[in-house]
């Protein structure tokens, strides 16, 4: 039994305690792609036809879309190999030219050897080997943000590895720091459905947090089953909670996370999800800068230069 491709939908939250309180939460979505099965079971290609135009759109936009769809037949909504509103473009992940200089040189070298021809699965396995000393013995599922209207943006992607008994065994976070456009990877082992893990911060992400801090992870992977349908066999799925706490010598500084429920990825779930959030990449970036504006201008949280340390 394998893991199905899924859409993970729910909420992301941020809560700052120091130096001032600041909280927000937004709807969020990850596409959960089974990298192990991707060659034999690619993502479905989903198109929109005139009858699929959402009723809640403004009248002028509905008329324009219906006219365009009648002329061009379809608008691609999801694709793995061609341009679409949402495209799974493997080159968007593990971008070697954006690795942070603080990342282990062995990882840089090992990832640089097969790129760009190596599959995303191989790159994830190599990264785990370097960061944890082992690789998953079962399937690997990527929790990623897809390219949206030809443009890729994601603050973080996650990769979950499973053992031969379908139990969570490995975790990898691909972190991007928006202002500086660099990436870093944190990897550690999972101990079943709930794992707590802590380590020193090794990558400057927020311009409002110093570098000498500690991360406290809580990763929960709750398995479930999807019933067989349309001659497809029963498949595994999961819901996920990923919570990251940040501490330093002042105490608990910050907390962020996602709580997401999985639905099997098929044409119906893709249509529904995209109708709800057609432009998630753009809204995510706008929200990041809006919250940064409120922190810096309205709440006077001091700016932290790249790799700036908190005075001891």
Model-identified regions with their sequence ranges:
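Mature, function-bearing regions of proteins
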Residues: 1-312
């Amino acid at each position: 039994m394998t893991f199905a491709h899924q859409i993970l939908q729910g909420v992301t939250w941020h809560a700052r305690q120091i130096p001032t309180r600041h909280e927000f939460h937004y709807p969020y979505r990850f596409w959960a792609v089974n990298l192990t099965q991707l060659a034999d079971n690619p993502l479905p290609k989903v198109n929109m036809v005139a009858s699929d135009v959402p009723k809640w759109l403004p009248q002028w936009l509905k008329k324009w879309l219906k006219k365009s769809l009648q002329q061009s037949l379809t608008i691609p909504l999801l694709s793995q190999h061609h341009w679409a509103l949402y495209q799974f473009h493997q080159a968007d992940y593990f971008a070697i030219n954006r690795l942070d200089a603080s990342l282990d040189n062995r990882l840089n070298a090992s990832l640089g050897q097969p790129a760009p021809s190596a599959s995303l699965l191989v790159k994830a396995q190599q990264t785990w080997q370097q960061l944890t000393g082992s690789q998953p013995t079962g399937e690997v599922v990527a929790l990623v943000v897809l390219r949206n209207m030809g443009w890729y943006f994601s603050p973080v992607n996650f990769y979950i590895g499973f053992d031969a008994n379908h139990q969570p065994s490995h975790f990898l976070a691909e972190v991007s720091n928006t202002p500086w456009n660099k990436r870093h990877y944190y990897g550690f082992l999972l101990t079943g459905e709930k794992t707590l893990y802590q380590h020193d911060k090794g990558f400057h992400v927020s311009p409002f947090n110093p570098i000498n801090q500690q991360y406290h992870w809580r990763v929960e992977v709750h398995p479930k089953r999807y019933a067989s349908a349309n001659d497809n066999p029963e498949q595994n799925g999961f819901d996920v909670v990923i919570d990251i706490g940040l501490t330093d010598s002042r105490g608990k500084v910050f907390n962020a996370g996602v709580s997401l429920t999985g639905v099997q990825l098929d044409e119906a779930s893709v249509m529904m999800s995209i109708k709800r959030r057609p432009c998630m990449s753009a809204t995510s970036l706008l929200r990041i800068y809006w919250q940064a504006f409120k922190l810096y201008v309205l709440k006077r949280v001091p700016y932290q230069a790249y790799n700036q340390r908190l005075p001891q």
